A protein has these predicted regions:
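Bacterial N-terminal signal peptides
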Residues: 11-25
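Compositionally biased, disordered extreme N-termini, encompassing classical targeting presequences
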Residues: 5, 21-31
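Hydrophobic small-molecule pocket/channel-lining residues, especially in calycin-type beta-barrels
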Residues: 27-164
Length: 164
């Protein structure tokens, strides 16, 4: 009889610990300040070499241990860049799909609670590095991009996004 009670107690304790761990993971993901819909604030952004996109919207949502990112950037020539990536924050390469001329893979790493670093590659070669920082109030996301774009031009962009 005591063995049955011991098993029941251990099972209940294990279930409680498992529930706490899972809830903690969900809460941590829900609190990720990168998650949300972000609209480019052109007045606060700088693009070198340019031209800047006409506008840009980035949607970031939780996906497993990382995020799914959906980017739409209408361009001055009337075209739209649309690309997506689902990646964990583990520094491993994940495919970039859509029409991003500068990348076909990305590796993402969480630096701290508000900062993500993304290393973009094209054909196995690093093209650009992005650092995405969310402000303390959670209303602004600043993305600094450095490197060389698909056209071989040196890139030094600071894109400021407002949370929608």
């Amino acid at each position: 009889m005591q063995t049955g009670m011991t098993r029941a107690c251990l099972s209940a304790a294990f279930a409680g610990v498992l529930a706490a761990v899972l809830a903690g993971g969900v809460l941590a993901q829900a609190a990720d300040p990168q998650v949300g819909t972000w609209k480019l604030n052109l007045a606060k952004s700088t693009y070198s070499p340019g031209p800047a996109p006409e506008s840009a919207t980035t949607k970031i949502e939780i996906a497993g241990a990382g995020t799914k990112i959906i980017v739409d950037q209408p361009q001055a020539d009337g075209s739209t860049r649309h690309w997506e990536v689902t990646a964990n924050y583990d520094g491993k390469d994940y495919p970039v799909t859509g029409n991003n001329p500068d990348a076909d893979m990305v590796a993402r790493t969480r630096i701290n609670a508000t900062t993500i670093q993304s290393v973009y590659k094209k054909g196995g070669k690093v093209t650009t590095t992005q650092t995405s920082v969310v402000s303390a109030d959670g209303k602004t996301r600043t993305v600094t991009t450095t490197g060389v774009n698909g056209a071989g031009q040196t890139v030094n962009n600071v894109a400021v996004y407002d949370k929608q």
